[in-house]
Amino acid sequence: MAFIQMNLLSQNLMRTVPVNVILPADKQQMPGMPAREEKPYKTLYLLHGIFGNYMDWVTGTKIMRYAEEHDLAVVMPSGDNSFYVDHPEAMNNYGKFVGKELVELTRKMFPLSRKKEDTFIGGLSMGGAGALLNGLKYHETFGYIVSLSGAFLIEELPHRTNDTVNVLERR
């Protein structure tokens, strides 16, 4: 199991962003068990909740064990308190960062599957809202979406944009 902490330079956010990555790359094989087939990893982009940070999933859950048991790469970016939506006036395009840039960068850096059906996005609270919004907006990238207690008081979203509302109104 590899646990990687890094800072990525984001063009969409105009700054570096802390990101944690879990890769079950050096998984121990028990004697008599078949070796792992060498193929790109299925990947979960996992978003934290408001007032949290990119370490919450590692320190407060069993995500590392889950990743190892399911041969799953997990990418956990810092989302500040952005709701993972674009704020072009402030040059904080978190939606584009999570839905496009982060996926492209991590696929270049790590052996991650490029298949839609192997690429998931999920989150808790604010991250759950961001996962649903960006999973729908970037539906050509994400095959599955998980929203855990998604914070969907859309009228009260900070820096709400018409784009945010339009994504939820689509069927």
PLM regions with names:
Residues 1-171:
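Non-catalytic cap/lid and distal C-terminal segments of serine-dependent acyl enzymes
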